[in-house]
Amino acid sequence: MDDSLKTITRDVLEVITPEELMDVLKKDEPVVYTGYEPSGRIHLGHALTVRKLRELQDAGFRVKILLADYHAYLNGKGSMERIRELADYNQKCFLALGLSPERTEFILGSSFQTEPEYTDLVYRLALITTLLRAKRSMAQITRESRDHKVAEVIYPLMQVIDMVYLGVDVALGGMEQRKIHMLARENLPRLGFDAPVCIHTPLLHGTDGSEKMSSSKGNFIAVDDSPDEIREKVKKSYCPMGETEGNPIIEIVKYFIMPEYGMMTIRRPEKFGGDLELELDELLEMYSSSELHPLDLKNAVSDYLVDMLEPVREYMEGV
């Protein structure tokens, strides 16, 4: 169990609470859930949580992925027809990223979110949730707008009740999900249900250096991009000399390449110091001190990403 806990908590920002997670790990097949809005290309930001889902699966969890079509609709991501088309594409991408088809359940939100019992629970939750609390929980999820819609406060209430319907032991998400997860932990016990354990992963910065990688902003590397597209996007990515914080290229190294390989080879001409074999701490130190040039790092990251995402491209071409 100690090894499982170490793997599950690696590269996460917080677990609420570690003690409760230990209890969950004693179950035969606990359930971890993540919800995704089908609203665009699947990119490295999604792959960050999928990697953690794979680790949880290896630790004995059953994975439930909510393809949140109604949530995407409430968040202004397009027509239901288009959203459902994207849900099918999303499912293929998640399997291509290595989730076990036997131990992964994909659930379309609209398959249960209009049932009377579900609606009744949403109403009961609405009665004990303040308007301010519901609005605050959506601050990092809704699109920027001055013309706010009532849909923005329905969204978090539905997400909380989703956890009841899916029999969730652990809710996994990026830090933008934290306030909704805390709403679930606070109010589900008041409705007679157990509070989920919450695991929060970092948000991957966009290739333009903005706070979050997003398909709607175009600042992403898709998991099914071609090798040429990957190289071009990495080449153009924000990667300031000597800066590691908020640097998407450094984050790709930290959260994708190093966990997979443990060490990274940086190819450089002899006149610029020759090739390097670096562990994460060494790479961060060299980059922080400007001993490692952004272009050399980008070239190496491109090579690794092209290699790592090749199985995804092959899978997607075959389905």
Swiss-Prot record:
It comes from Methanothermobacter thermautotrophicus (strain ATCC 29096 / DSM 1053 / JCM 10044 / NBRC 100330 / Delta H) (Methanobacterium thermoautotrophicum). The keyword Cytoplasm applies. Homodimer. PROSITE patterns: AA_TRNA_LIGASE_I (PS00178). The keyword Cytoplasm applies. A motif ('KMSKS' region) lies at residues 212-216. NCBIfam families: PRK08560.1 (NF006330), tyrS (TIGR00234). Catalyzes the attachment of tyrosine to tRNA(Tyr) in a two-step reaction: tyrosine is first activated by ATP to form Tyr-AMP and then transferred to the acceptor end of tRNA(Tyr). GO terms for molecular function: ATP binding; tyrosine-tRNA ligase activity. The gene is tyrS. One of its GO terms (cellular component) is cytoplasm. L-tyrosine binds at Y33, Y155, Q159, D162, Q177. Disulfide bonds: none annotated. Belongs to the class-I aminoacyl-tRNA synthetase family. TyrS type 3 subfamily. ATP binds at S215. A motif ('HIGH' region) lies at residues 38-46. It is found in: Cytoplasm. This is Tyrosine--tRNA ligase.
